[in-house]
Amino acid sequence: LAHPATPNDEGSLLARLAEGLGSGNLDHRIFNRDFSDAAVAEPFAMPLADIEQADAIILFGTNIRHELPLLHQRIRKANTHRNAKVYAVNPVDFDFAFSLAGKQIVAPSKLANALEDATLIDAVKGATRPVLIVGALAENHPQAASLRAAARKFAAATGAALCRIPQGANAVGLARNGMLPAKRDVVGMFAE
């Protein structure tokens, strides 16, 4: 197991070492619990700076102020300078430094269904540059695969750019460098 902040060169060497030893038991997704959709970290669907140009932003399962303060600031800028409408769908009523056009505070088991809310979908459908940001609470949820599926469905229905926050400083780099299981994932390794 490697921490998701491990540098690319170390992750790549570890992956090659594991392969040379005949082991496919390696992973960097130490915070994830649901691997049923074999999800890995991926780059945002748009450049980070472009989020300031969004006119509708949906925060899904994230305390963005804590997870990525720089992104929180860009959302604040979009909200205050461009009047972007920001919506939050979370299990906790987090404090943000920008105003929310709407929020749904739901039980963790109801997060996936919250994105099916017709009012939220209609509000976002009218936007020209909508963005859906999926955070740690969704990515590390016990049913994260269903939450990711709900996020993909919502993004497709509304035309929103899907931006999943990587769960580690170098999670995208490690995924690209092969630091992924060929056999057992993190949950499987700990179960043994």
Positions of the model-derived regions?
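Catalytic alpha/large subunits of respiratory electron-transfer oxidoreductases
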Residues: 1-192
